[in-house]
């Protein structure tokens, strides 16, 4: 009898222990740690400073970290900045390509530049992604899968639609926390992780990354209480967390990278993942298999903070719109001329013209929030693109007109 009691008691203890273990595993927080060194192409400095100082800091510092810390993954956005790395720092660029191939230097954002997404036309936004993806495919044999805009001043309802039509699956930003005017009350962002539905009903996964300048000092992040608390804001028990630097490029601090490494090896209640910017989105595909994901159907504007961006530096907005319209007209005429066999399609000229003015749609450039000297470079590039589009349009129309039979009876 006593043996039976002992056996039953032991079974209950073991079952209870197993249940507690399963329950702990079930409740374990998952933290996707997304490193970044967001670099403003122009803001309180001009493009020359960006190329000579900040681009160099970004590539050199992160190559050092990638060699020193085996779990470190770096995310960096903006195809034009990769092009500058290739032009100005070719030796480091070739070294970086090896880490891209290994998946440790991650191409974030899919686009030619981290542009404003409210002032540019839809055509420009799609071109921005197309130009970026083309560059990444040709240079690295890879493409991006997400829209990565940590620092833009609001996001229109068309963005999920544009993203899905370009084959992208996710969107992240930290800027929604700036919607801190009482006007927003408790609706700064609809959720921290969920689905965002566009105007046509197509959806991307949305992740709020929090402050991209977050730092830690060599602590075990698997036991970090802040990460645990932030994860409670989603029904997924999951956190998407930027860390690194903002505006001037560079890299996360040594202490921050060590903290992520310690967290990966730690045994606390947080499962720490050194993540690419799109890993969370890929882990939840297909989205319709996850009914627990909340859905937002609307726009995410910054009505207070970003309002002046729609009118500041009116000349930039004029040049930008002229380029959008002239570029469209030039391409239509050039296609017609080639189809008629009267001219060769000027692909290189048109591509370079689009690239040159589209990167000035950057969220501190076209928006009118940079220093006056920065616009000396911006206006110059806008005018060069206008000239190139104008020449392509004129030559194409002349080629078409030269083949037209305008003879009529007198």
Where are these regions (language model features)?
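C-terminal segment of classical bacterial N-terminal signal peptides
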Residues: 15-20
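Catalytic-domain carbohydrate-binding cleft regions of carbohydrate-active enzymes
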Residues: 21-410
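Short, Lys/Arg-enriched, disordered terminal segments
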Residues: 1-5, 21
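Sec-dependent N-terminal signal peptides
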Residues: 4-14
